[in-house]
């Protein structure tokens, strides 16, 4: 069994210790779930749904906290602090999510929110984020049907309207003249497919299409 870093995993409790419980990580060995996250009544043999990430000493560790983003997902997160290496985002866990300067489209500012993509850095095997989200959108042609309901994340304002990330995978566009409610970056909404262009861009709108017949 191989566990998935930056994702939820169903892992079995193998033993209890004074500072938490250890979970069966298969080929990755035993993984600590610290006491503060151990459910009441938890015992060896129980299977827990936990999120796995690296602690400050780069050790694989488990938590029952719910992060604001998982690996291979997009989200709008706030900058908690900045140092000489990059920015650190609040994603709901004890250890903040790192965005190196090379992955920032513009220099990030503390307290501001940005659309990012979370991924595992190939060189360091750490969970990192990138504000260059266009690099992580699928180049495949979406196979959507007209009027199909999709989940979208509002990405950025353009001269034509708002760019959106569709189903955590594709690029979409809402035209200004078809928007009848206030929108802002980071909003998550239900939308409907109006058209998929030859270049793969999904034209979407928020109002549910009128059904005929």
Predicted regions: what is each one?
Residues 1-5, 55-75, 102-104, 130-146, ...:
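Short boundary/loop segments of OB/S1/cold-shock single-stranded nucleic-acid-binding domains
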Residues 1-49, 54-56:
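N-terminal, positively charged regions that mediate nucleic acid binding
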Residues 11-13, 45-58, 77-81, 112-125, ...:
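Flexible glycine-rich surface loops and low-complexity tracts that mediate binding to linear polymers
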Residues 19-22, 85-88, 160-163, 201:
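Short aromatic-glycine-enriched beta-strand elements
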Residues 29-42, 95-107, 170-182:
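Beta-strand/loop nucleic-acid-binding surfaces
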Residues 69-70, 76-141, 155:
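Intrinsically disordered, low-complexity linker/loop segments enriched in Gly/Pro
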Residues 145-201:
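Aromatic-anchored, glycine/proline-accented short structural segments
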Residues 204-213:
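Single conserved hydrophobic/aromatic residue that forms the stacking wall/gate
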